Amino acid sequence: MVHLGALPGTPLYDEQRGLEGLVAQARADLVALQEAGVDAVMFGNENDRPYELEVGTASVAAMAYVIGRLRPDVRVPFGVDVLWDPCATVALAAATGAVFAREIFTGLYASDMGLWSRQAARALRDRRLYGREDLFLMFNVSAEFASPLDARSVVERARSAVFSSLADAVLVSGPMTGEPASLEVLARVKQALPDVPVLANTGVTHDNVAEVLRVADGCIVGTCLKKDGITWNPVDPQRAVAFMERVRRIREAIM
């Protein structure tokens, strides 16, 4: 993950550093991750706390500006996520040429931000309107900071997201950013969806990545690669290198 700094207009935005400061820090994180050998990177606005369910155009424009400035430095496939707005995420992906996008596309949740009522239908129609049918959509089916107002299990919600909402991949999360998803739930979701990529979305660390990759097809990693393992800190190049070295050993053992 390349967590962009707080964007203009959000409570934690650093006006002194400005947009150029955001570009500089994101570039440093991007370079560190690529030199460590990651498979892909995803740009997100995790620092825009408290989060919005409908993100303003100014934030989307700022993210597009930063990503556009970084495009010459990007050497791996990249994706985007505009928390917590699936339509803004698809729009940003279309504007920047992202290969994949992550968001909460389905479900009804009670959360710190109020009630989430997601509409995959609109987001996927936007994808079609933008001419980006190739955009790979990863559906988070167990939202952080929220509880589903749905009696169905995570497995049932995941199966439904694929069947009725055309999810390209399914993500399983822990209760908070940086906290792990249940390995048991991950395994059950993967067993139910053998032909669909299933990834761990939060809380993957140097210590548990081997267990995660035994049951999931992949993982999205942010917090454990940061300085001192703190989500809001810059990427620590040494932690990133150590993590990817461990992943390579795991892959060699599996193969």
Question: Predicted regions: what is each one?
Answer:
Residues 80, 85-98, 156-157, 189-194, ...:
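Catalytic cores of alpha/beta
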Residues 2-28, 78-85, 139-155, 200-206:
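Active-site mouth loops of central-metabolism enzymes
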Residues 4-13, 88, 92-169:
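Conserved anion-binding
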Residues 33, 41, 101, 161, ...:
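Conserved, mostly hydrophobic/aromatic
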Residues 52-80, 118-139, 181-205, 238-254:
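Alpha-helix-loop-beta-strand connector modules within alpha/beta enzyme cores
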Residues 1-2, 41-43, 78-80, 101-103, ...:
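Hydrophobic faces of well-ordered beta-strands that scaffold small-molecule active sites
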Residues 151-170, 177-195, 207:
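Short loop-to-alpha-helix "cap/lid" segments that border enzyme active sites
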Residues 37-62, 108-112, 167-180, 228-230:
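Glycine-rich, proline-tolerant flexible connector loops at the mouths of alpha/beta enzymes
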